[in-house]
Amino acid sequence: MSEQNTIINSEEIKENEKIESETEEPITYLDLTGQPHTSIGDSYNIPETLLDLDLTNCKITKIENINHLKNLKKLCFRQNLIEKIENIDQLKELESLDLYDNKLQVIENIKDFQSLTYLDLSFNEIRIVENLSIKDIPKIKELYLANNKITKIENLQELVPIKNLELGSNRLREIENLENLVNIETLWLGRNKITEIKGINHLSHLRILSLQSNRLTEIGVKGLVGLNCLEELYLSHNGITDIDGLQSLKQLRTLDISANKIKTLVGLNELPDLDEIWCNDNLVDSMDNIEQQVTKSIKCLYFERNPVATHVQYRRMFINMFPQLKQLDATMVKRN
């Protein structure tokens, strides 16, 4: 089955409102991105053979006229004006549902989607995480709830299969209720109001953790213990003064502690796999401290806008100090 015969894009629809394949092959993908219309399927037919329907940025206000798409696997309503999740109960084969950037206030009608692995409800007006049951979405792997008005991590305990959880840009004050989500590999909690790293020690599969732009003042000796697979840690734009607590992260490759209030580096010499350190916009003033703490195999360093970076020989000293360094701040390292 050739892609040309099974895909209809928005440019074709503009010329021909009746959606038909030029061959006998069924249409499986319909892209109506950027074509404003008040009602789905009002002036055009939607082939029941569709596997993928993209209605991004169409000014749609209501989900309707798609329940006949029994084979649909991917449904995208990004950047519309939808206020309610409805009229999708017959889409039993759905694997991906994208409602990013709409007007949703409530999570509802996510019922009996036995194949759903991807759900994006980011950039809406949701206040409470609710109505997400493991019996309804038993295969869920990725859940995106960024940029809503959520104040509490709750009602996710059943969703054990989740590997990627995005709750950034909400109103969270505490990391909590993640005890059962032992399969999480990436956790995004940036741009909240979190003051303490806790409640994640059991996430032994976690590879990426983002807590940027919160209200942290320290990492804490026990906060990250148990995260033996962590490879990337993002802690920029907090009020951190003490980074003690990193020592157990033996797999860590990328550390972002930029834009904090850090004066002294601690524990980095115990992280053998560290490739990148972003420590710009801090208070580090000792070249000796950096030399003692940073592994000689480091490949990328950011220390601009620290007192130490005002040294007239700053760049030359760093290049000599770290023989494998490939990038210092925003500039690639050139060696003679």
Curated annotation (Swiss-Prot):
Transmembrane segments: none annotated. InterPro entries: Leu-rich_rpt, Leu-rich_rpt_typical-subtyp, LRR_dom_sf, U2A'_phosphoprotein32A_C. Residues 1-10 have a biased composition (Low complexity). Residues 306-336 form the LRRCT domain. It is found in: Nucleus. Pfam families: LRR_8. GO terms for cellular component: nucleus. Residues 11-21 have a biased composition (Basic and acidic residues). SMART domains: LRR_SD22, LRR_TYP, LRRcap. LRR repeats lie at residues 26-47, 49-70, 71-92, 93-114, 115-136, 139-160, 161-182, 183-204, 205-225, 229-250, 251-272, 273-294. Keywords: Leucine-rich repeat, Nucleus, Repeat. Residues 1-24 are annotated as: Disordered. The keyword Repeat applies. Regulatory subunit of protein phosphatase 1. Belongs to the SDS22 family. This is Protein phosphatase 1 regulatory subunit pprA. The gene is pprA.
